[in-house]
Amino acid sequence: MDENQTAALFADLESSNKPTIRAAVDKLVKLTADAPTLADELSRLLDDSRGKHRWPAAYILAHLPHPSQRVFNVLINALDHPDADIRWAVMLLLVRLAKTDGEIVRLLFELRETGTPTQRRMALYCIRDLNLTDTASLQALLDSLRDDDPTVRVAAVTSLKGRLGIDSGGRKMLYDIFVNDPDLRVRNAAAVTLAQLGAPSGEFLAALKLAEASEHAQLRKAATAALSIIQKRRSAPAGG
C-alpha cells in the first residue's frame, strides 16, 4: 500500500461515520503488524490534543505484541466515550487482552472504584465477561451494589447473575436492593438476579408477591418474570 493510501486510512480515522472508522481500523491493524513506521506514527497520535485519533490509534496498537501502558490508559479512558458502540468495542478488546494480562485486570478493578459512572459501569461489564471465579472479583461486584450511581448498581446486579459462591450476606444485599433501592431499574434487575440464583427465601417470595401488585408496571413485570424463573427452576428435572 502506497503512502497516499495509508494517509487516506489515517484521514478516515477522523471520520464521523463509524463504518468508515471501523474499516480503516481493521485495515491498519493488518498493515501495522508488518510496518514499524506505522506503529510509530500511531504512537504519536496517542497524544493528539483533539482526542479524535487517540482511541482508534490505541485500538490498533493494542493488537501488536506487548502494547505500552499508554495504549492501555487511552483504552481505559475510551470506556467513557459518549458513543456506546465505541465503548463496547473497546470493552471487548480489553476483555480479550485481560485474559492473558493481569495488569489490565488490575486497571479494571481500579477503574471500578475511581472512574466516572460510565467507566465504572463498563469496568463491571469487563469483570463480568472475564468470567472470574475468585473471591476478589465477587467482592468487587458486591461492593458496587452500594455505588452512588444507579446505572452502576444495575451493572453490578446483572453481573452477579452467573456468579457462584454468593453467600447469605450477598443475597441479603440483593434482597435489600430489591425492596429498598430508590431507583426502579435497580430493583427490577435485583428481582431477576435473585431469582436466577435459586433457593429463594420466604421473604423474597413475599416481596415478589407484593411487587406483582405494584402501581409501577415495570416492577410488576420484573416480579412476574422473577416468579416465572423460580417456578421453572422448581419444575426442572433434578440434575437437568
Q: PLM features: residue spans?
A:
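Long hydrophobic alpha-helical segments typical of transmembrane helices together
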Residues: 207, 213-223
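Structural detector for internal amphipathic alpha-helices that build alpha-solenoid repeat scaffolds
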Residues: 1, 19-34, 52-67, 77, ...
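Positively charged, hydrophobic/aromatic-enriched amphipathic segments
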Residues: 11, 17-24, 43-44
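Short inter-helical turns and helix N-cap capping residues of alpha-solenoid HEAT/ARM repeat scaffolds
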Residues: 16-18, 49-50, 82-83, 115-116, ...
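Amphipathic alpha-helical scaffolding segments comprising HEAT/armadillo-like alpha-solenoid repeats
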Residues: 1-12, 33-47, 66-80, 99-112, ...
